[in-house]
Amino acid sequence: GFMTKYDVYAESNVVLKLEDFEADAFGQKDSGVAIQKALEKAKALSDEGKSVTLMFEKDGLYRVTKENALEREVHTSNTDSVDFPVKKIGVLVEGIKNLTIEGNNSHIVFEGDMMYLRIFQSENIKVNNLSWDVKVASTTEMSIFNVNEAGNEVYFLFRRHSHIRWKIGG
């Protein structure tokens, strides 16, 4: 039969729902494996020439932990890539073309020291309406407002940003 441009687009665009891959939109369980399974399916569809939209649930809260993160050798400017070239990656988009990640105002909380999102050897990748943060920051920002020298010692007085949680132990 006769096909319009819209019909051709509809057949070549596939929507993958994250919930179909057993992701937990309530933030109780780690969704890292589910997200990566969905991205593996997206890659397979991409290899067939299809465009893919990966759909998060509306206003979801997703956890991604270091324990289930993928590993890749990555050289970046802000890490020790010579001694530690292998990095954990929370969400890895690799070798995919024509992917839209529709977050639907969802939020990912990354737990553990890892690269949060890596897009590698991919083309035409869009990320919409998705935010993320870390459960515990691996670095802390502060402002130094005074430096004192006493003999061979240097003392810094700093002011932490109000949103930083901290404790000094010893």
Which residues does each predicted region cover?
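A residue-level signal for beta-strand positions that form part of recognition/binding surfaces
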Residues: 13-15, 53, 124
